[in-house]
Amino acid sequence: MSRLAVLALISLFVLPVRQGMADDFRVIPNAAMREEYNDNIFFSDDAEQDDFITTASAGLEVRERTELLKAALITRLDGLAYADNSELNAIEEYYKGSVGYQLNPFLNLSADAGYSVDSRSDRDLDVTGYVLSTDVRRRQDYSFSADYRASEKTSLFSSYSYLDDQFETSEVDEFTGQNVLVGLTRSLDFTKPTAARLYGRYSHYDFYSSKVDNYSVTAGFSRQFSEKLSYVFDIGPRYTEGSEKRTSETSYDNGLGGQLTLTYNEELTTAEMNIFHEVTGSSGRDGATERTGLVLSLKHRIGERSSVRLGIDSYQNKATRDEAFATDLNELTTSLAPSLRYEFNPEIFCEATYRYTVITDQEADHEKHRNLMFFKLTYQYPVVE
């Protein structure tokens, strides 16, 4: 049913536009082979187990673009084969669709839908800092947004998103999240392009044994220092209410949240740093957490066909049971990942990556380490362009 919902959404905007002779329509099939060595596939702190993993991927990308509409459908199947732990072999599925439509010169509407089936224990590591079990997860997510230009200087924004994670055997890890966001930006008359920002957000998280409601308001600025350097800064209060399903006991907490994003772009080098603090929920933990994150990405082109990249991710997930959170948690996850990419031609490219990860449980005072290395070869060829 979830797969059909995603594909039905895509057909609603792709097929009618094709009949109307779109300005730009592309169909791009792709295939990839990834060979990986992982020295701690279960992220164990006392019984590390290594393995070689082969991942064969096949996918299809369909893109549609006209003066008023942008649409995309991306599908991919990954076949995972473990050299020693064959019981972990799996087929992972990914489906993603998006559509954006310019209703008039002032109003733009967009929608996204996604469905995936995955099982790797590190599937969320780069996003949340969490390590999961190898239980099969079925995820569906949907979002809708509207941008309205109220005047030459003022814009309004609103969005709604829904995420549902269901696991094949473990109910404890299941999670449903909903987010509502409204915002306003206004350009200011400064010498450099600057905009004031005001956002309000409501989030509802439904876990196995608890529910959490979080309310936040942030105010800040975005500013373009130069053609190469820009920043975004937001900060504001939040109020959190958590309740246990079994006892209906409710607790409350409050604090600050926000973000700082710096972006640098030039011809050969791009860099971005994002620092944020928020209350959020995700699958793999029975309760919300206060998450503080640092994400740094640096990319440099060293030749016409080659580039290097350095990624650093660090997430601290904290929760105190007496403060609107269901469990005690104090965990720091840090990863370092240098990589090299080479393009043989526009259709074929390869990537070599090393990734080191350390997870520190600051409650129990112990660490888990993992080294991962992989080489990936990708082929993509537009059959309709």
Could you describe each region identified by the protein language model?
Residues 1-26, 382-385:
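Cleavable N-terminal export/targeting peptides
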